[in-house]
């Protein structure tokens, strides 16, 4: 009898575990395509806190970069071009496109000058001025820049590391066709 009870407990526990393992990962936060984007809330150049979630409803490119990063600065014209082209577009899951720029700078003046020189005209710029030890980089597991995540209006990651024409192509795929 004890063996039968033990066996039933094992079977029931296994069924319970399997049932929950196969449930869809709805609202799972992470950094992979299909995950809900992890919240970021850090200081803007004027010292206010800006949360990624404040942009909900828009398609957002979370763009990790720095003023001292040559490849980042070379990519900035592509990001600016995409911003200008898509900022007022309607998407399947979002209205408008913007950039949430996350700087890995340590020097605020260098960060501000790069924003101005590169014409990064969107208003969502954040940094904790922690460089490679910055909290946003740790949260997203950033170990090289430039790197980015594209999220839809519901905060779901729909693309990653989209540079050059790949960003336009990804935005074209999720734009609402007229």
Which residues make up each language-model segment?
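Extracytoplasmic/secreted envelope proteins and their assembly/folding machinery
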Residues: 76, 80-83, 108, 112, ...
């Amino acid at each position: 009898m004890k063996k039968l009870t033990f066996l039933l407990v094992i079977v029931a526990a296994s069924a319970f575990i399997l049932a929950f393992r196969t449930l869809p990962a709805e609202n799972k936060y992470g950094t992979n395509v299909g995950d809900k984007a992890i919240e970021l809330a850090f200081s803007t150049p004027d010292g206010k806190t800006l949360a990624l979630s404040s942009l909900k409803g828009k398609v957002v490119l979370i763009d990790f970069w720095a003023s001292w990063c040559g490849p980042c600065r070379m990519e900035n014209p592509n990001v600016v071009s995409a911003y200008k082209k898509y900022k007022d577009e309607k998407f399947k899951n979002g209205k408008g496109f913007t950039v949430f720029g996350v700087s890995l700078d340590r020097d605020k003046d260098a960060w501000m000058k790069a924003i101005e020189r590169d014409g990064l005209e969107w208003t969502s710029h954040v940094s904790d001025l922690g460089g490679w030890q910055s909290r946003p980089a740790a949260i997203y597991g950033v170990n090289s820049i430039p790197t980015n995540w594209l999220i839809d209006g519901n905060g779901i990651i729909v693309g990653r590391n989209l540079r050059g024409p790949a960003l336009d192509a990804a935005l074209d795929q999720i734009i609402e066709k007229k």
